[in-house]
Every structure is written in C-alpha cells, then in structure tokens.
Amino acid sequence: MLNLTLAQLNFTVGDVEGNKEKILKVIDEYSEKSHIIAFPELSLSGYPPEDLLLQPHFLKECEKAFDQIIHHTRNYDVIVAVGLPYYEFDLYNALAVIHRGEVLGIYKKHFLPNYSVFDEYRYFRKGEEPLMIEVNGHKVSFSICEDIWYPDGVERQTALSGAELIVNVNASPYHVNKYSFKESFLKSRAEDNLCFVAYVNLVGGQDELVFDGRSIVISPFGKLVARAKAFEEDILTVTLDLGEAKRKRLLDLRWREGSYGREKVNVKRSVSLPDKEFFRGRIEENPKEEEEIYAALKLSLRDYVRKNGFEKVVLGLSGGIDSSFVACLAVDALGRENVKGVYMPSQFSSKESYEDAKALAQNLGIEFHVIPIKEIYRAYFNEFEKEICEITFDVADENIQARIRANILFYFSNKFRYLVLSTSNKSETAVGYTTIYGDMAGGFAPIKDVYKTWVYKLARYRNSISPDIPERVFKKPPSAELRPNQTDQDVLPPYEILDQILMLYIEENLSPEEIIRKGLPRDAVYKTINMIRKNEYKRKQAPIGPKITSRAFGKDWRMPVTNKFFK
C-alpha cells in the first residue's frame, strides 16, 4: 500500500517566498500520513512565470527557495515532488523528487507546449531522460503535464519498464468541456499502460488563465479512485494498492507484448518507507456547465483583484444584462462591501434602466451612485460646435457618452484605488460593438470570453441561487442607449445567430463559406467576419479577462492589426 497526497494549491506567480511557505506547510501537515506528496507544475515559481524566467535574479530566488525545501525535508520520512524552473547548463521545466534532505532525481519536462496560450519553447530546453524510483518495492515514475498527452511518450516507456504508478504534475488551464475530455483520456492512459495514473493540477487565477484543480487518480482498470474539488484549494490523500497493476498485467497480454524490444528504464533510487494510515479515495462532485463556468469566472476575478493588491471594484450599472451579471459576480467573488455601482444616465437613458439598476444594487446590498452625464455631454458638444459649426449626430456623438462614463469610473479608481471592471462580453468584443476607451475600458474584464447568449444563461443560473437581477432585465431588448430607441440588433444579427457564427469562426476555425454550409445566412456571416477583421485594433487594447472557451481573445488569438486577408 502507498499513500499518495496531491497538493492542489493556489500559487502566485513571482511570490517565490509565499509559494515556498505553502509547500513547507503541506509537508509539515501531511508527511505523517503520506508516502509521496506531489505539488503542481512550477509550483515554486507560479505558472506561467513568462519572462520572469529570463531574469537571472528570479531564477536565483527559486534556487534559494528550493534549497530551503530540501533542507526542510531532512526530518520527514516522505517523498516530496516539487515543480520548479531548474537551471543546469540550460533552463528546464522540472520536477524535483526529494527524500530526507536528498534529491533523488530531477525530472525535466519532455514535451514543451507551444500552441494556444503556451510559449514554453521560448524559455525551456526539452528534457530527455525518464525518472523512476522504487518505493517499498513498487516502481513509481514522474512526468509533467504535456508529457502525458502523448500516447507513446515517457509514461509508456516507464510503464513498460514496470512502473505501477505514474505521477503527472500539471498547470493545466480551464476551458469549457475540457475536463470531461481530460478525465476520459486519463482513464485511457491508465488502461493502456495498466497502471495507476495520478494527476495533480494547479488551481487559481493568473491573469487571463484559470486553473480548475480537479486533481484525480485513476486505477489500472480505468476506474476513478479519487477526485479533488473544482476551483478550490484541496489536499487529496488516498491509499493505493499498487499490486492492482501487477494483477491487471497478468490478465492483459498487451503490456507483455508491448514491452518486447523496448529500451528499459532503470530505477533511479530505491526508498523504504514505513506503513501509514489507510485513506479511502474521496471523489468530489463534478459541477454542471453553468455552475462550472460561474465558478471559473468568480475565482479568476477574486484572484486577479487580491493578487494585484486591490480590495474593492467599481463598475458602471446600466440596467442591462451584462453589467447586472458582472455586479452579481463581483459580489459573490469579493463581498458586497467591496463593490461599488455607478449609474450614469444621459438624455437617452430610460426610466426603466434606472429602476432596474437601482433595484439590482438594492438587492445585492452594494453602494450605489447616480451621476448624470447629460450636462457633461452638453459641455463637450458646445465646445465641438464652436470649432466644427454644424454637427450632425452620429456614432462619434454616441461614443463620447461612453468615454465620459469611463472617465467617471476611472476617477473613482484613481481617487479610492478601486479596480474598474469592464462589462464587455465576447460577442461585442469580437465584432467591435464596444467603444474603445469607453465601455471597453477597465482594469479587468470578467466576461470578456463569455458570449452574449451565455451571459443570459449564466445570469439565469445566478438568479436561481438568489434572484437579484430584475426579471425585466432578461426580457427587454439589449441596448447601449446612446441614441433614441436604439437596440443592438440595429447593427448586429440576432445574438442567437451571431454567437453561432463567432463560435464556428473563432473556436472551430471555419472559413466563411464553411460556416454558410452549416446553414447560417450568407449576409450575416460575411458581415460578422468583416467586423471581426476590422476591429482587431480594439481587441489589442482591451483589458485582460478570464479565458473560458477553447479559443479566447488574448494569448490565444494573435491576428495582425494590419491585415488585408479576407476570404
């Protein structure tokens, strides 16, 4: 029997000292009940450290903290696996395996992702050697994140050399539908290699990335043995009968046949550890889609605010669905006492919008201010009229209202050190239906990667918990209220159609003609994609926000601003 502890923790990029202290605390508290304690990928530096990895003094701090962890383990009879940047003639994404003040081995990540949000080739050299140790007569191998996604990679090599447990440490970002696929594929890895697979993941928000945790252990029979909580720190200890791997291999000749002609991996070190208390696997519930997305957005917002030294946020409340939903999210993430809402009516704002914004603020119990912009707008208009003479009201006059509102919000930010939340959604950001330096402005954009139709679904989910958003907000046509009788559909296709086009174009990477063949209207498709192309300059200047789809604007989307291609 082997007791494995997966330390699913929320680390902070660059806080080497704080991250080290978290690691030491877990070692102190869990060494008596564990044979192996595994921490996530690059847990010492935080993930992703990006260009901090190019600073020698940062690497020196990581090395110093690593030495302190090694020293700390001298009095504990437990194996500790810690992720860190490791310099040895070159820089590696590494995993150090330590026992009683001695490094048993350093595993260096083999497969470096360089797609989507990942840039690991920019920083790291690929590792080449596997790492397998023997614990109480059982072979245990280690790997890092991307390595396990390759069916014939290091896990296969060590399994065919007798590994009964593969410990894979991760910093795997969340997006919708990823977890179910990941769990299914990890079960396949365990069944194919006829061994236990333990997958420990990071949890928390880091800029635009969200890490969902949900560390899991799978048996050689493909059975889920243990699963940690979603979107929360969790320490998961489980007792594994590693003899299961041997029993399974005696029944399944694939392992024997697959091992012929393969280069064998030798055991790096053997360690004998005392028997420890039995722990049955705990399987935490997997959240449903709306609950999962909401938890991701909430965690991302909370971590961005707190890790960057803010306490309070301010946002404009328009009486519409986007700002209403973001206000609810902010209250749930930060507490009502830390959220300020500002309603800024113009001559085009309706009485209903004021009533809905006020009702929302009262329901949430947040501080609520009303600052009319009509006279401010008139002062702008009068000054422009002196120079331009006759002015015909058009989109420039609409946008100046949004920019006045942004100035007011940033006054609160500057005066009281509140973080301004942008309430722009993915549908608007995609097609540029947002005012640059206006409603698009902010320090963080919590729904930047949430399609408009999803905003409605998530708001309904939030109202099922507490009905704080007035029902009228769901039913009225969406409008920026920048001119009389305006609705979003004056300019855009219906959101039900628009969002389908956006998903097919952005996430599934289809061409306009391929989208049309899916049954969507030709005019709407070409209009939408032309708007996407023309508004790249806006997206380049948008605040960051959490990635929750398979392809988000930001690190995931690297289109040129100057671009003539359109087919």
Curated annotation (Swiss-Prot):
Reactions listed under catalytic activity: deamido-NAD(+) + L-glutamine + ATP + H2O = L-glutamate + AMP + diphosphate + NAD(+) + H(+)
GO molecular function (one): NAD+ synthase (glutamine-hydrolyzing) activity
Residues involved in L-glutamine binding: 115, 172, 178
Catalytic residues (UniProt): 41 (proton acceptor), 109 (for glutaminase activity), 145 (nucleophile)
Positions with a binding annotation for deamido-NAD(+): 399, 428, 538
InterPro entries: C-N_Hydrolase (IPR003010), C-N_Hydrolase_sf (IPR036526), Gln-dep_NAD_synthase (IPR014445), NAD/GMP_synthase (IPR022310), NAD_synthase (IPR003694), Rossmann-like_a/b/a_fold (IPR014729)
Residue ranges, annotated region (Ligase): 287-567
Sites where the protein binds ATP: 316-323, 423
Family: In the C-terminal section; belongs to the NAD synthetase family.
Described function: Catalyzes the ATP-dependent amidation of deamido-NAD to form NAD. Uses L-glutamine as a nitrogen source.
PANTHER family named in the record: GLUTAMINE-DEPENDENT NAD(+) SYNTHETASE, NH 3 /GLUTAMINE-DEPENDENT NAD + SYNTHETASE
Name of the protein described by the UniProt record: Glutamine-dependent NAD(+) synthetase
Organism the protein comes from: Aquifex aeolicus (strain VF5)
Gene: nadE
